[in-house]
Swiss-Prot record:
InterPro entries from the UniProt entry: Ribosomal_eL20, Ribosomal_eL20_dom
Record Pfam families: Ribosomal_L18A
Assembly and oligomerization: Part of the 50S ribosomal subunit. Binds 23S rRNA.
Native organism taxonomy: Archaea, Methanobacteriati, Methanobacteriota, Methanomada group, Methanococci
Family matches, as HAMAP family: Ribosomal_eL20
Keyword DNA-binding included in the entry's annotation: no
Identification of the protein by name: Large ribosomal subunit protein eL20
Gene this protein is translated from: rpl18a
Residues annotated as transmembrane: none
Length: 76
């Protein structure tokens, strides 16, 4: 059964820390972490060691902030 996971964190090592929030529809929290590390490392050219995860939480469909994820879930 899939669940929606919200990851809050920051990228350190740049001029200023960059705060981010990402939401994923995954089976395991580990899958969400791996996807987040891959996306953030690719987009911002940072190593995994420079990405600090502050919070990982499972959320309900009503709490989704990402409009693309929300529309995708509405289709099913």
């Amino acid at each position: 059964m899939a669940k929606i996971v919200r990851i809050k964190g920051e990228i350190i090592g740049k001029d200023e820390p960059m705060v981010f929030t990402k939401e994923y529809n995954v089976v395991k929290e580990d899958d969400a972490l791996e996807t987040m590390y891959s996306e953030m490392g690719s987009k911002h050219a940072v190593k995994r060691a420079n990405i600090k995860v502050v919070e990982i939480s499972e959320i309900s469909e009503e709490d989704i902030q990402n409009p693309i994820l929300k529309k995708t879930l509405e289709m099913y």
